[in-house]
Amino acid sequence: MGFRINTNVAALNAKANADLNSKSLDASLSRLSSGLRINSAADDASGMAIKDSLRSQANTLGQAISNGNDALGILQTADKAMDEQLKILDTIKTKATQAAQDGQSLKTRTMLQADINRLMEELDNIANTTSFNGKQLLSGNFINQEFQIGASSNQTVKASIGATQSSKIGLTRFETGSRISVGGEVQFTLKNYNGIDDFKFQKVVISTSVGTGLGALADEINKNADKTGVRATFTVETRGMGAVRAGATSDDFAINGVKIGKVDYKDGDANGALVSAINSVKDTTGVEASIDENGKLLLTSREGRGIKIEGNIGRGAFINPNMLENYGRLSLVKNDGKDILISGTNLSAIGFGTGNMISQASVSLRESKGQIDANVADAMGFNSANKGNILGGYSSVSAYMSSTGSGFSSGSGFSVGSGKNYSTGFANTIAISAASQLSAVYNVSAGSGFSSGSNLSQFATMKTSAGNTLGVKDETAGVTTLKGAMAVMDIAETAITNLDQIRADIGSVQNQVTSTINNITVTQVNVKAAESQIRDVDFAAESANYSKANILAQSGSYAMAQANSVQQNVLRLLQ
């Protein structure tokens, strides 16, 4: 080998290798101290880009999980609030059921209504105060609210919570047909009962026979109510226009074809002769008689078949001639507030024909709290009077009482007291025509007036002219009447269904959000694992690399020392 001293190639090679090994040792120490395989872009440029993308995705998924948990918190808050509202509605329905029996007096029903009013106030209070982070949840404004639950934009879930105030829930549809005076065979069909299909009921005969009438039709409708959502009730009542006065029926007096014969009865049917005679055959006729709180005769068909009075019941019963044949009124209830669409044949025989006046109303829970409007009351089937206009009637109805109080004068048209002269009471009949609107009962708007005479203690005249309106009266609030209590039961049931539907929707969204959170949690773990594979150092492998670099550093130092000492051998050649 040659000996050169100007250029120590061996030492230079040793130094170069030592420099490279020093860099490897530095990198290894950096990885071991940080725990990261990539500490700078120079370590792995493409790997750094991938791991940064994965880290961003993992962090975003973590926030998405937090968003989802916020959504769950909101939905659970609303759900628990509505659970309390449902308990309130259950109590309201229970109290309405308690009021729906004639063992209750007006006083006790009024107390029950007061309880219901308080419950409604609390229900509304819950609806108006339930909030999350200042956002109202049950007021109806929490609609189409979005929650980002993905790593990329617009990966959202939407949540809506319907309004739960008493004015927004319980919307129930009530429809009642006109009073029926002519029977016949009826084919009744509910149109689009589920939004698509029609439901055709079995044919029903409206008559006075057993197994016929509105009762039979109501049974047919109600046994399919779970499918159609429509329920039916009926009212078949014939009521006198005034308190019963002494009189007698004719020898051929009969109800629904069953002969009762002659009956002498007293004022108010004090001896019970008229009621007893009618009730003696009630199992055959299906008609039960009673005297109401105003002393009027009330005939009721419990089974829903018609009431047909034949012969002469006597003027003392004050039965309107137009009511001698009465098949009642049919009322329909639907628990969604939408119109009840019907079709069929001979619908006039159930009061729902083209020419019939049908009362219709949709009522919310809150509306049942106050006085029930006359139109709504009629739609609920409160009244048996029909809407219409008076076309003609008495030119005047006058009453006179002397200062001695001896009673009304003979020939006055109506009389009370000892005279009992009511022979001219029905000299004229009143004709009714259809009208689009109705007034409160007894509100005679035209040609009416009262005057008092100077020499008479009491004198009154009221003219009933053609064109005057006739209708039904407003009803008292909620459960203060039997019919009202029944209606509140229907409305409360609808409100419960409404809240259950809202809660079901919330539950569906909760399940959706929970599933999404579970999914993105797994995704986040997998993304972090992938990032770790790229970014984090393998301590076992890196420890081996460090040991190698450390040994090479030591051996390199020895080699460099030896390379420098080799040049000393040149001195021996110069000795």
Swiss-Prot record:
Alphabetical list of InterPro entries matching this protein: Flagellin, Flagellin_C, Flagellin_C_sub2, Flagellin_hook_IN_motif, Flagellin_N
DNA repair in keyword set: no
Keywords of the record: Bacterial flagellum, Repeat, Secreted
Domain of life: Bacteria
GO cellular component, one term: extracellular region
SUPFAM superfamilies, alphabetized: Phase 1 flagellin
A molecular function (GO) term: structural molecule activity
The keyword Repeat belongs to this UniProt entry's keyword annotation: yes
UniProt repeat feature Sequence, residue ranges: 405-409, 411-415, 447-450
Pfam family, one: Flagellin_IN
PANTHER family with a match to the protein in the record: FLAGELLIN
Subunit: Heteromer of flaA and flaB.
Family of the protein in this entry: Belongs to the bacterial flagellin family.
NCBIfam families xref list: PRK08411.1, PRK13589.1
Record-given protein name: Flagellin A
Record organism: Campylobacter jejuni
Designated gene of the protein: flaA
